[in-house]
Amino acid sequence: MMTTLLPVFTKPSPLALNALRAGRICRFLLIPDGRIR
């Protein structure tokens, strides 16, 4: 897993950064209120 992610971190691209941000946002939105409360 790490070996495949290394090139992404060594050469960060706007598309990769946007994908990571979108993934994080989706996770926050998908988290049920039950877990937060």
UniProtKB/Swiss-Prot annotation:
It comes from the Bacteria. Induction: Expressed in exponential and stationary phase in rich medium; expression is a bit higher in stationary phase (at protein level). This is Protein YhiY. It comes from Escherichia coli (strain K12). Pfam families: YhiY (PF23514).
